[in-house]
Each structure stands twice: as structure tokens, then as C-alpha cells.
Amino acid sequence: MKSSKLHLLTCSLLTLLLISCSEDNRADHAAQYPPNTSQKADTKFLRFTDESRGEGVMEAAIATYEGKNGEKVELISAVHVADTAYYERLEKLFAGYDSVLYELIKAKGVKPPEKGRRKRGESGGMVSWFQRYMRDTLQLDFQLEAIDYRAKNFVHADLDAETFQRLSEERGETIVQLMLKLALAEFKISKEGKSKTDQNIGLKLIAALFMPDSARALKYLFAQQLENMESLMAGLGEGPDGKGSVLLTERNKKCMSVLRERLKRGDKNIGVFYGGAHMADLEKRIFKEIGFRRTGVRWEQAWVVRRAEQTPAKKPAKK
């Protein structure tokens, strides 16, 4: 049961991260200000409020950072499958930025997917299958289907597929290797008694599948576990060689390179729309590389888990 639990968690973590470098050109885009050493990079970017009885709210953070000349950068923690209302609110928010830097590993020259387009019937491997499962079973929307990535102010700030593959091959980094690394990290945390993972998650998942309101029950279980994702995924930004992973570290380097380019171009209000697992490392880089200060954190509801209201049974008509 424990091995199946770990397999489920690691597959889920990597899948959510993958939905969605070349060397860091720091010399070309040097930080405008000295490093911010007065603040600690400890922002929490995902939280679940358990309201008991199988209900609760999962929220994603939007953290604001400001430079001395009025520049503003916001880290918008993305939840890749979420309630429709969450994406509708984000779309309104995005319209107000000079530029929105987004994550998406795609081939060079290929446009991002059109909003609302679904590719049912295509296999796409394990990742695509899991995406469809999450969307359909949990009755949620996909980020790539609900957000207009072709908006004029959207700027690609991720590795292209060719670079990602090349760097991964150079380092011998595979999905299996990363899944094993995450599983070992979870095992270590569990052994130290610090794990937040429900030891009975496997049984609860099976039970949830057979509930009349299975979508609500499964959303509740997944939401409880997603908080644990941040600390586990942060481990991918570390490594014995100090280089971190391609999946997280190199993509974040690319994102920061594009961010410096946009600041150099004169953008004053920039949104960075990246998965929550990337945010802890991105915050560190914002402090260290461009010297901005964190000035606030606000929250957006991504999943609202509620039981359906019970409709009172109709009284039989009087004869």
C-alpha cells in the first residue's frame, strides 16, 4: 500500500509540473539593484483550508515584488487543473499586465494551444492520460484550455522542447529518475516523522471512487495532498552537483532571463504565471538576481470543494 501511495503521489506531482536552458545570460541582463538580503524567501504558494466533512478550499498565492523605480513583478502560482471561476479571474488579472511570462515546453516556432481547444482521442502518453483523468473525473478545467495563451501580452518564458530534451539527455535526467528521487524524498520525510501524507490515502482513494459524489470526494483527497507538493518539488532544485534539475532549475533560469529582458525593455508591471512548484526557487532568484522586495501576498481560490446541497424530499400530494 505504501509503494502504491508513493507511486501515485510522485506521478501526480510530475504530471502537474509537466503540463505546462540554455546557459543563464546574467552578464547581459545584470540585476538593477543589489541583492535583497533583508527578506527570507519563505513564501507559501499553495494552501488548503480543511473545513471538515469532506469540504475545503485550496488557494494559490500571488506574491508581489517591487523595485526601487516602481517596477512590479508578481509571481502567479498556477494550478494546472482548477475550477472554471479561478481561470476566469486570472484572465481578468492578466489583461492588466504589460507582459505575462508563462511556462510551456513546446517546439521552437510553434504557437501555444488555442483557448478552449481539447484534443480528445489522442493518446499522448501517461501525462496526457492523467491530465484527461484529472479534468474529467474531478470535473475541473485545464489551464491550457481555459487560458488564452495567444493574448498579445503573453510572453513565452520557458525552455523549448529541443533544448529541454538536449539538457535532459546530457545530464541523464529521465522521468523515471525524477520519480524515484521524489519517492525517496517522501520516504525520508516519512521516516523522520515529518510527512504530511495521509498513510491511508490508497484506501481513501478507492472508497472515493465509489461514492455517489466521487468528484467532490476525490478533489478533497487530492487537495489535502497538494500542499505537500511544494516541499517535495523544491528538492528538484537541489542536487549533489549544485546544478539542480532541468525540469525545475534550468526552466527557472530561462524564466529569469526573459524577466530581465522585459525589465530592460521598460515593462513596469509583469506577471509570471508558473506552476506552484517553481515558485520557491523563483522567489530566491528575484531576491538575489534583481534585488526586488516582497511587498505583499494575496490568495485566489483554485478549488472549492463543497457537498451538493441536499434537496428535501417532496411530500406526497394530498389526495
Predicted regions mapped to residue ranges:
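Generic low-complexity segments that are intrinsically disordered, proline-rich and/or Lys/Arg-biased
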Residues: 8, 35-36, 313, 317
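Short, well-ordered coil/turn elements that cap or connect secondary structure elements
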Residues: 16, 68-70, 265, 289
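Structured, acidic catalytic/metal-binding patches in enzyme active sites
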Residues: 25-250, 295-305
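C-terminal motif of bacterial Sec signal peptides marking the signal peptidase cleavage site
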Residues: 18-20
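Bacterial N-terminal signal peptides that target proteins for export
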Residues: 2-9
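A cross-kingdom marker for long, charged
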Residues: 245, 249-319
